[in-house]
């Protein structure tokens, strides 16, 4: 998708296949809609009064308006004017792009980012517009025998109309949003691929492909022997249950900070269970197909690296991905087994379906060698987090208030929100074992919290936060598919650090 800017002069003379103008739920027209209304002898107001309610993201296409050069004027709902905010703007931009896709339009012009929003500057509005357009034009057909090429979106270019003095900031926001959209696209596609295609080896190959495409990226993909040499006994114990070879992926983005700093890199750690059957503690058959999404933490790390490399972000970032399958077999972990992690801590495995923390703990120990300024792990870790927060907010766990504030702010800014969960030391008692240093589960109460508490035992050498994306990484039902979250949150966090 190509994005560019144009000045607001002579809107009615812009020649385009589709021109988007905003309409509020109370019938009030945005400034751009008012211009088009006057040029068309009040045609817009007449239609709005008769049949358009202005719900956020709703669209109504008007063809061949008199006095207007655009082939189509698309009325886009903005919601109530008194409640218009960044989320309503994103819904409007996505609704417009979706309408263009449905009409098989190749290029379009939007005036929506020009509508001012309190505490949301034009750069942020432009960034959101590009992300929304990317979401509307995403199309998956990688595993269809005969892909319907006519179903692929034709929309290739959107021009944002803004005030002349805002063009530079708008263009920067569009550039950032486009990169984030590309990262989300990669994340979604990796998540949507089936487990027999998107294997640990496939994830490693994807990382290598990114490193070939972007000169700022370096990659190392470790195999079983190398992981054994590191002493990653916990990770190995999970991988042992499958014939599919494990991979431990180390990605580095060597940014060039404007100012020299002694601070270490930001490290992102992704859970890469490419299929999770639960192991010996077998999951129910219903919806087990969705356990291909158990690598969405890893996918989000790869998507984030794709975005930050495209932007050439002046920041040093390391990505770590522990990738394997969790299957039942004669070599798989058994309830009651005890394994030794890379940190030296022993773990009693009471439930083999709590495997994500078993691979992450060794990755968190590996992260120590980078002397990081902060570590954020991303994982579809617990169903308990879905029970607690549903599918709206990602669960955020940390005892570092400053890091929590930075991640929460990034979530609000990017509309990829998180909610901070408790991590009181008292929860650690649930992880006590009579036979090892720690048990891998703490019983039903506060399951997402005790999972985070388990990880915290392996992250004491640095500032650390855990994002549980079990409720936000994918959707079920008729719209089943990966969402690309939390790439926007992670990228906003990194943009704020740069």
UniProtKB/Swiss-Prot annotation:
The keyword Lipoprotein does not apply. Pfam families: Peptidase_M17 (PF00883), Peptidase_M17_N (PF02789). It is found in: Cytoplasm. One of its GO terms (cellular component) is cytoplasm. Mn(2+) 2 binds at residues 271, 276, 294, 355. It catalyses: Release of an N-terminal amino acid, Xaa-|-Yaa-, in which Xaa is preferably Leu, but may be other amino acids including Pro although not Arg or Lys, and Yaa may be Pro. Amino acid amides and methyl esters are also readily hydrolyzed, but rates on arylamides are exceedingly low; Release of an N-terminal amino acid, preferentially leucine, but not glutamic or aspartic acids. Its EC number is 3.4.11.1, 3.4.11.10. One of its GO terms (molecular function) is manganese ion binding. Presumably involved in the processing and regular turnover of intracellular proteins. Catalyzes the removal of unsubstituted N-terminal amino acids from various peptides. This is Probable cytosol aminopeptidase. It comes from Bordetella petrii (strain ATCC BAA-461 / DSM 12804 / CCUG 43448). The lineage of its organism: Bacteria, Pseudomonadati, Pseudomonadota, Betaproteobacteria, Burkholderiales. The gene is pepA.
């Amino acid at each position: 998708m190509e994005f560019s800017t144009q000045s607001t002069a002579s809107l009615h003379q812009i020649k385009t296949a589709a021109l988007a103008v905003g309409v509020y739920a109370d019938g009030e027209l945005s400034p751009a809609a008012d211009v088009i209304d006057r040029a068309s002898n009040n045609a817009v107001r007449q239609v709005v009064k008769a049949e358009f309610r202005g719900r956020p993201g709703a669209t109504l296409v008007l063809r061949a308006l008199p006095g207007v050069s655009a082939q189509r004027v698309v009325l886009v709902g903005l919601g109530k004017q008194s409640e218009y905010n960044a989320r309503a703007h994103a819904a409007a931009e996505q609704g417009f792009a979706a309408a263009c896709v449905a009409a098989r339009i190749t290029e379009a012009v939007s005036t929506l980012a020009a509508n001012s929003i309190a505490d949301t500057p034009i750069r942020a509005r432009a960034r959101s517009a590009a992300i929304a357009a990317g979401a509307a034009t995403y199309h998956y057909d990688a595993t269809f025998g005969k892909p319907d090429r006519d179903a692929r979106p034709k929309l290739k270019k959107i021009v944002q109309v803004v005030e002349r003095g805002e063009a530079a900031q708008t263009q920067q926001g569009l550039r950032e949003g486009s990169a984030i959209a590309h990262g989300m696209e990669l994340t979604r596609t990796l998540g949507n691929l089936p487990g027999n295609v998107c294997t640990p080896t496939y994830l490693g190959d994807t990382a290598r492909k990114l490193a070939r495409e972007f000169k700022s990226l370096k990659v190392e993909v470790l195999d079983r022997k190398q992981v054994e040499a590191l002493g990653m006994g916990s990770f190995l114990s999970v991988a042992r249950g499958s014939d599919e070879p494990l991979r431990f992926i180390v990605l580095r983005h060597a940014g060039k900070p404007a100012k020299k700093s002694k601070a270490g890199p930001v490290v992102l750690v992704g859970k890469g269970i490419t299929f999770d059957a639960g192991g010996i503690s077998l999951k129910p058959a219903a919806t087990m197909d969705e356990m291909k999404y158990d690598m969405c933490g890893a996918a989000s790390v790869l998507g984030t690296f794709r975005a930050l490399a495209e932007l050439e972000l002046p920041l040093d970032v390391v990505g770590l991905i522990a990738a394997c399958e969790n299957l039942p077999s004669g070599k798989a972990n058994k309830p009651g087994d005890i394994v030794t992690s890379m940190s030296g801590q022993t773990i009693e495995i009471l439930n083999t379906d709590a495997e994500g923390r078993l691979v992450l703990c060794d990755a968190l120990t590996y992260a120590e060698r980078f002397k990081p300024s902060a570590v954020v792990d991303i994982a579809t870790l617990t169903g308990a987090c879905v029970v607690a927060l549903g599918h709206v907010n990602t669960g955020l766990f940390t005892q570092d208030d400053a890091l929590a504030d930075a991640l929460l702010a990034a979530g609000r800014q990017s509309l990829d929100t998180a909610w901070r969960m408790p991590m009181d030391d008292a929860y650690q008692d649930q992880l006590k074992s009579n036979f090892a240093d720690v048990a891998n589960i703490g019983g039903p109460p506060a399951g997402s919290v005790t999972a985070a508490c388990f990880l915290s035992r392996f992250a004491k050498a640095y500032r650390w936060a855990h994002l549980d994306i079990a409720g936000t990484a994918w959707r079920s039902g008729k719209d089943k598919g990966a969402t690309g979250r939390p790439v926007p949150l992670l990228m906003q966090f990194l943009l704020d650090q740069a």
